[in-house]
């Protein structure tokens, strides 16, 4: 786990933590819950578990037991499955505290996360957004740190505990460097002021909200891990829906947003890369015709890249490891294998 920071009791944080839950295995959910409730210090924490109409009786029972076992845990039951965007919004609406944090039901908060944030607030009392880096916990137990955000800051914005990233620099940095929503803590009003989570999006609704928040407030960025992303088992990030246009909807929404025109060049390249990623993974999963379609959509974003389209079409003659190896030249995105799933959406 990331190193626990020095304790600073001079500043406390009252935080409502939102966690959407849909059929999460009880053992996995219990670890996520414990990582939030075990945060040391005098911070007041409430954990809001939004049950997104789970159908697994074991998950439903685990949610009930969590609320019965700790007065800081509240369960909000939805009568239909709405997806993480709407579930998070419901959680925020139910929150009591000024600061809002997030965790996915299969991820972790590292030890000392709130202590780190409290130290930032001690140095920057006007802080409205406290962010940080993350690490990925692999299935073999290996913890892989992510690349940290880097941005040019004047000396006045570099503090002892964090550096203050302001727009447009912060917006452009966030466009090109995805960080999980759970790395950040927000003052509640920022979420509302930025328009809340877009319930129409399956992917990228959290990233899009952070981009919009970056236009409203600086991010006080801690150069340390404030979140642990688990790559174990099934999740939306490893769903066959990653092979559909839904995987690019959030990117397209950002590109169409007039307020984000300051990052239009970066967003254009991101959409182009998103279509290439979907094209590649369709080809790897036996959907070569669909892959061709998404490769053509990528070309509509940047018609100058005919050479990359021709390379992709040539690679489609290959199969198996030869195809996977060749496609690494077409897209550097993660290659996903859904061969164990009988039917792809």
Language-model segments: which ranges?
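Glycine-rich, basic loop-to-helix element that forms the pyrophosphate-binding segment
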Residues: 78-95
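Conserved nucleotide-sugar donor-binding catalytic segment
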Residues: 17, 155-243
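Acidic donor-binding/catalytic loop of UDP-sugar-dependent glycosyltransferases
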Residues: 27, 57, 107-120, 138
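Short aromatic/hydrophobic "clamp" motif used to bind/position activated sugar donors
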Residues: 100
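Catalytic core of nucleotide-sugar-dependent glycosyltransferases
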Residues: 225-233, 238-265, 288-301, 337
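Flexible acidic/His/Gly-enriched loops in nucleotide-sugar-dependent glycosyltransferase catalytic domains
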Residues: 70-71, 86, 114-190
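Short, acidic, metal-binding catalytic loop of nucleotide-sugar glycosyltransferases
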Residues: 34-44
């Amino acid at each position: 786990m990331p190193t626990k920071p020095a304790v600073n009791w001079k500043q406390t944080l009252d935080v409502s933590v939102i966690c959407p839950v849909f059929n999460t295995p009880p053992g996995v959910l219990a670890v996520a819950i414990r990582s939030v409730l075990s945060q040391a210090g005098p911070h007041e924490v409430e954990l809001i578990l939004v049950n997104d109409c789970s159908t697994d009786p074991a998950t439903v029972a685990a949610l009930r037991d969590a609320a019965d076992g700790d007065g800081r845990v509240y369960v909000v039951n939805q009568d239909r499955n709405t997806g993480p965007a709407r579930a998070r919004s419901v959680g925020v609406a139910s929150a009591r505290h000024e600061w809002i944090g997030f965790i996915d039901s299969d991820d972790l908060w590292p030890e000392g996360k709130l202590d780190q944030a409290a130290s930032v607030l001690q140095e920057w009392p006007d802080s409205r957004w406290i962010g940080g880096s993350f690490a990925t916990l692999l299935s073999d137990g290996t913890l892989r740190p992510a690349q940290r955000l880097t941005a040019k800051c004047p000396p006045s914005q570099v503090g002892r505990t964090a550096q203050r990233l302001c727009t447009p620099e912060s917006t452009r940095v966030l466009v090109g460097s995805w960080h999980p929503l759970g790395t950040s803590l927000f003052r509640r009003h920022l979420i509302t002021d930025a328009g809340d989570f877009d319930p129409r999006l399956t992917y990228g609704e959290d990233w899009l909200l952070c981009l919009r928040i970056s236009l409203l407030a600086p991010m006080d960025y801690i150069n340390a891990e404030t979140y642990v992303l688990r790559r174990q088992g099934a999740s939306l990030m490893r769903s066959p829906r990653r092979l559909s246009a839904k995987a690019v909807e959030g990117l397209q929404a950002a590109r169409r947003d007039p307020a984000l025109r300051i990052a239009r060049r970066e967003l254009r390249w991101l959409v182009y890369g998103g279509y290439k990623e979907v094209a590649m993974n369709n080809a790897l999963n036996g959907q070569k015709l669909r892959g061709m379609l998404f490769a053509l959509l990528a070309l509509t974003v940047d018609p100058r890249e005919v050479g990359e389209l021709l390379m992709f079409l040539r690679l489609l003659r290959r199969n198996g490891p030869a195809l996977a190896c060749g496609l690494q030249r077409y897209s550097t995105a993660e290659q996903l294998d859904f061969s164990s799933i009988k039917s792809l959406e």
